[in-house]
């Protein structure tokens, strides 16, 4: 079975909302994964597939405007109830992007582009919505050799290598400023769970996720002391001026 057989990202709603609920238990994870992106988050920021906005909470105080985009209106309502100043747009990213602003200083995509068969076309849309000098800030699953039933269940078309992100950036007009692995320990856990046919976050019980949240500073330290292939790649791509 391949991800081509799965319902696409925009319509796998029940699984998506359930995963968002699980991720609410990991505030330290969001702080950690967004930390490398914070220097590039300024001005007007558009976050794609923002969900309930847990990641936005890590940078909202340092930018002038946030536009949260998601296909699920209920998740956006939850986001706006906590952050009334955030503008929300209910948009299917697989369709047209006419409603999205075209003057973003940064666009954030955390675990998004792997859900689109034509990731090049997707990133070209991102390019068109950024100001010259603006940044596409991306997190994607790393290591194609780890591709498994979990990826299929999660609606992933692929996992990424550094070279693939470099090629994708070049083919869409971006300059790759930063590409690096994150979460070395997470990659080891993924290998043990890879035969399970469900979203990765749903393979953990709530108590386990709370424990992981407590351990995030240790995981971050391990990444710094023993860098290596991780569960994810963080990328900072710049639209040339």
Q: What residues fall within each predicted segment?
A:
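A short glycine-rich, Lys/Arg-flanked "PGG" loop and its adjoining helix->strand segment in the class I
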Residues: 120-135
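Core SAM-dependent methyltransferase catalytic element
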Residues: 191-198, 228-241
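C-terminal helical/coil "lid" or tail adjacent to the Rossmann-like core of SAM-dependent
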Residues: 186-215
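Short, glycine-/aromatic-enriched active-site segment of Class I SAM-dependent methyltransferases
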Residues: 20, 136-158, 162-168
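A short His-aromatic
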Residues: 111, 115
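Conserved S-adenosyl-L-methionine
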Residues: 174-184
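Conserved N-terminal segment of class I S-adenosyl-L-methionine
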Residues: 1-110, 120-123, 202, 210, ...
